[in-house]
A protein has these predicted regions:
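Extracytoplasmic gate region of multi-pass secondary transporters
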Residues: 31-32, 226-270, 277-280
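Conserved MFS/SLC helix-loop-helix module at the cytosolic interface between two early adjacent transmembrane helices
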Residues: 62-101
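Cytoplasmic helix-loop-helix junction between adjacent transmembrane helices
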Residues: 106-147
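Helix-loop-helix hairpin linking two adjacent transmembrane segments in secondary transporters
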Residues: 141-192
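C-terminal transmembrane helical hairpin of 12-TM major facilitator-type secondary transporters
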Residues: 293-342
Length: 362
């Protein structure tokens, strides 16, 4: 099969996991996009806002690895459906926030519900796409995180400004229901023939990883012994941490430091997300075509993140944000398409969820 020619089943799977991961980010980032308005309405300080952002990641860190393990044990279809229901329910409850503790608790719960999503989706991609298709598939899949930034910043600040922040959360909570129905009918394990083909395509090192092991302890030991996976976890800790630090704080930074409105900051972040949306599938497709190793290409694009961030931080003219913002979006997100493709490539076929959960724990 040509690496850029996907079957109908592959397209449906990719669309389903793309929308699932997209909505996990829309719900995650809905807080950041309305934070300037919500903080003022509930008299939260900037420090309290930071703690609410951190609450999500505390919950996320608790379930990202167990969620991957669960996806390998009970199937990624079940973990995806459960996460969609949980995220929708918690986001709806966020419209009832009245104080700091309630906000912290709900943000924590949202993180718990979001933890299994990425590992489950990557596991599905690993099952349905061959090694020469995964760069493109993962690049397209990871573009949803950038589109999530664009989407939430297009509507949430506007809805919060004109109809109240509570309405913004309720509107966000409705979105996963349609995707839940789609995933219920489309997300399935591939046929035994396809699964046998994927096993045969796995690299020798990955094929040996954990074969015959049923113990969780032994499976984790095998993952930890894989140098590629350890390096990806360390790289992800620094690169992904910086990416989401920038994304979570950019709206508030522009409002408080540069004096723009919440709607204006949302427009800048929409352009930021759109640029990243284009960059990720592009670099993923190129990684499948160019005679360059994915790890070398990943190192190059990670290096470019630094200058892009310095350029954005040096921007004092609000109009220039529409130029430096997209540049930062490209620099901040391009690496994720490559690193996640490398995760799928490095993992044993039956441990893809666990491996993705382990790497994304960092």
């Amino acid at each position: 099969m040509n690496r850029l020619s996907f079957s109908r089943t592959q397209i449906l799977i990719l669309l389903s996991v793309w929308l699932t991961f997209l909505l996990s980010f829309v719900m995650r980032l809905s807080w950041s996009s309305v934070m300037p308005i919500l903080n003022e309405a509930l008299h939260f300080t900037a420090k309290m806002g930071a703690q609410h952002i951190s609450a999500f990641y505390f919950g996320y860190a608790l379930t990202v690895l167990p969620g991957g393990i669960l996806a390998d044990k009970i199937g990624y279809r079940r973990t995806i459906l459960f996460s969609l229901i949980g995220m929708a329910a918690v986001t709806a409850l966020m419209s009832t926030i009245t104080d700091y503790n309630m906000a912290w608790g709900l943000r924590f719960l949202l993180g718990v519900m979001s933890g299994p999503v990425q590992a489950s989706c990557l596991s599905a991609i690993g099952d349905h796409f061959g090694p020469n298709q995964r760069g493109a598939a993962v690049g397209i899949f990871m573009s949803c995180t950038s589109f999530g930034i664009t989407t939430v910043n297009l509507y949430a600040p506007y809805v919060a400004t004109h109809y109240g922040w509570q309405t913004a959360f309720l509107a966000t909570a409705i979105l996963p229901l349609a995707v839940l129905v789609l995933c219920y009918f489309t997300v399935r394990k591939p046929s035994a023939e396809i699964m046998a083909q994927r096993e045969a395509e796995a690299s020798e090192a990955a094929a040996k990883l954990g074969v015959g092991q049923t113990s969780l302890k032994e499976n984790l030991k095998h993952i930890l012994s894989n140098r590629n996976i350890r390096c990806l976890a360390i790289a992800g800790f620094f690169a992904t941490g910086t990416t989401w630090g920038v994304t979570q704080w950019a709206n508030l930074y522009m409002v408080k430091q540069l004096g723009v409105t919440a709607i204006y900051a949302g427009q800048v972040m929409s352009v930021f997300g759109t640029a990243a949306l284009i960059a990720k599938p592009t670099i993923g497709i190129l990684s499948d075509i160019l005679p360059i190793k994915k790890n070398h290409l990943a190192a190059l694009v990670m290096f470019l993140f630094g200058p892009a961030l310095i350029l954005f931080a040096s921007t004092s003219n609000p109009n220039m944000l529409f130029i430096t913002g997209p540049i930062l979006g490209i620099g901040a997100f391009m690496h994720s398409a490559l690193t996640n493709a490398l995760v799928v490539q490095s993992a044993a076929p039956h441990l893809r969820g666990t491996t993705a959960g382990f790497v994304n724990l960092f």
